[in-house]
């Protein structure tokens, strides 16, 4: 399963508007199921992931290091457990710099389980529901 990237601001904002998030020591994970027509179809409608690390984390070198560590953790976990049709946003926290890599991977797995976005390899799991619009 190929994992596409979220790149546009509107994609990040749509996931954040879904209000499904879990904070762990090294990261914050936001998830949202893509509703029909909400995003252009991707090949195989696989999962998409976006990364963001704010300037509060540190300078460019530290932010890029956090982003690389998170990208590596996501590659390891998503290979077997990401669900198709779901957008994930991973927000890096300052603690991700000094956190052991196995702990960072465990943070991501725990956040995915808590949000109902952790699929077992080879078996479909129930995905989070799309956000309900406030307007009728």
Task: Show the residue positions of the predicted features.
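Positively charged, solvent-exposed patches that mediate nucleic-acid binding
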Residues: 1-136
């Amino acid at each position: 399963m190929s994992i596409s990237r979220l790149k546009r601001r509107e994609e990040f904002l749509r996931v954040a508007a879904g209000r499904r998030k879990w904070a762990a020591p090294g990261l914050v994970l936001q998830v949202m199921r893509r509703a029909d027509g909400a995003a252009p179809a991707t090949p195989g409608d696989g999962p998409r992931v976006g990364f963001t690390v704010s300037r509060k984390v540190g300078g460019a070198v530290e932010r890029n290091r956090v982003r690389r560590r998170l990208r590596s953790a996501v590659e390891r976990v998503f290979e077997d457990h990401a669900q198709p049709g779901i957008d994930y946003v991973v927000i890096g926290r300052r603690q991700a710099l000094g956190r052991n890599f196995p702990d960072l991977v465990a943070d991501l797995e725990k956040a995915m389980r808590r949000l109902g976005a952790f699929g077992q390899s080879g078996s479909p799991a129930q995905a989070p529901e799309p956000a309900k619009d406030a307007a009728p």
